[in-house]
């Protein structure tokens, strides 16, 4: 995955279960705490990303993380539920692999604070995505974050590099 891909997903509690179902339907495999720790320890060794997992197909990731037996033929990426974000949570940084961290926020303000912590750790200047029916939240995020773009209600991986129907240049 590129830097433009969804790296971390923050979901407010009121729609968390619904979002989890949607992520699983899209091919996500939700890991338990032990599996999450195994992926983290394998992907980051001595504070650096393991090149054996960078930009690899999901089959390679599943094999190297010993998750092949847990996955079905529809698995496209791994979901690492987590709580901590920022400097003391290495998984909240760049991954460049077929997995993302998933956070559950109490409300929008908590989600905004998590996004800022993630961005301050590794990502100042990177784009942020927001899915919301409340336009004011996009403005609030844009004003609070040190970002180049706030992508609203679009697939982040396509929209951040420009897209035919969103008006952003390629």
Question: Which functions belong to the PLM regions below?
Answer:
Residues 1, 68-69, 92, 140-144:
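A general structural signal for short secondary-structure junctions and capping/turn motifs
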Residues 6, 99, 147-148:
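Short, well-ordered alpha-helix to beta-strand connector turns
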Residues 8, 100-101, 127-129:
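Short aromatic/hydrophobic contact patches that present stacked aromatics
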Residues 12, 80, 105, 131, ...:
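Generic beta-strand/beta-sheet core signal
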Residues 19, 23, 138-141:
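Hydrophobic packing residues within well-ordered alpha-helices of enzyme cores
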Residues 14-17, 24-124:
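NAD(P)-dependent aldehyde/semialdehyde dehydrogenase
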Residues 1-11:
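Active-site PLP-lysine loop of aminotransferase-like
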Residues 113-170:
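C-terminal core of ALDH-fold dehydrogenases
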């Amino acid at each position: 995955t590129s830097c433009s891909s969804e790296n971390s997903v923050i979901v407010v509690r009121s729609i968390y279960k619904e979002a989890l179902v949607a992520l699983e339907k899209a091919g996500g495999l939700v890991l338990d705490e032990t599996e999450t720790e195994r992926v983290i320890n394998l992907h980051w060794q001595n504070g650096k990303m393991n090149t054996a997992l960078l930009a690899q197909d999901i089959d390679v990731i599943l094999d190297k993380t010993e998750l092949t037996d847990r996955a079905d033929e529809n698995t496209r990426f791994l979901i690492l539920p987590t709580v901590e974000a920022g400097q003391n949570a290495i998984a909240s940084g760049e991954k460049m692999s077929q997995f993302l961290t998933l956070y559950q926020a109490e409300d929008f303000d908590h989600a905004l604070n998590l996004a800022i912590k993630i961005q301050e750790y590794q990502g100042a200047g990177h784009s942020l995505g927001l899915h919301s029916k409340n336009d004011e939240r996009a403005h609030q995020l844009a004003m609070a974050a040190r970002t180049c773009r706030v992508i609203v209600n679009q697939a982040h991986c396509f929209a951040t590099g420009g897209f035919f129907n969103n008006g952003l240049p390629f």
